[in-house]
Amino acid sequence: MTNKKQSASSQRWLKEHFDDKYVQEAQKKGWRSRAVFKLDEVQSRDKLLRPAMTVVDLGAAPGSWSQYLAEKVGDKGQVIACDILPMDSLAGVDFLQGDFREEAVLSALLKRIDGKNVDVVLSDMAPNMSGNNSVDQAGSMYLVELALDMCNQVLKKNGAFIVKVFQGEGFDQFLQDVRNSFKTVKIRKPDASRARSREVYIVATGYKL
C-alpha cells in the first residue's frame, strides 16, 4: 500500500513538474532549473546585480542561479559558487564542491573570496528533507544562519544578501538578526515559488559593516 501511495505521489509530482510553465520555460531558454525565475523576479524588483560585481552563490547546484549571475556581472565580475552536490562547469563561475557546514570547506571558500570584497551573498540552500517538519526546519535555519555569518565575514559595506528561508520556528528571530545587520530588509514570495511551499526570500540591502 505504501509503495502504491508513493508511486501515485511520484507520478503526480512528475506530471506537475513537466506541466509547470517555469520548467518548460527554463528548458526552452537553456537554464539549468526553474529556480532561475525566482532570482530573476527579485532582480527585476530590487535591481541588486550589476556588471563587475563579485557575488557568492551558496547552494548553487545544478547551477541556474550561477548561470544568471555570470550573465549579470559579466566578464569583469566574479561568481564564486559552492554546493555539497557536484555541478557541471560554467563559464565565469568559480565552483567549489563541498559541505558548507564543514570548517575546511568554509576556509577554502573564504580563501577564494580573499577579504571583504563581496557585493552580494546569495543562498538558495536547503537541507535534505527527512519528512520530520521540526528537524527539517531546524536544519534549514542552521543553513541560513551560516549564510548570514558568511555575510559578516565577506560583505562590503552596503552589500546585499538574498536568502531562501522556510517560514516556521526560528524565522522571526532570523529576520530580526538580518534587520540588525542591514539597513533595508524585504520579504519576497516570487511567482515562481510554488504556492504550497513555505519558502520565501529575504532580500536585504545596505550592509552595516
From Swiss-Prot:
Protein transport in keyword set: no
The keyword Cytoplasm is assigned to this record: yes
Top-level division of the source organism's lineage: Bacteria
Active site: K164
UniProt entry keywords in alphabetical sequence: Cytoplasm, Methyltransferase, rRNA processing, S-adenosyl-L-methionine, Transferase
GO cellular component: cytoplasm
InterPro entries: RNA_methyltr_RlmE, RNA_MeTrfase_FtsJ_dom, rRNA-MeTfrase_E, SAM-dependent_MTases_sf
A single MF term (Gene Ontology): rRNA (uridine-2'-O-)-methyltransferase activity
NCBIfam families the record matches: PRK11188.1
HAMAP family (UniProt xref): RNA_methyltr_E (MF_01547)
Protein name, entry field: Ribosomal RNA large subunit methyltransferase E
Organism field: Pseudoalteromonas translucida (strain TAC 125)
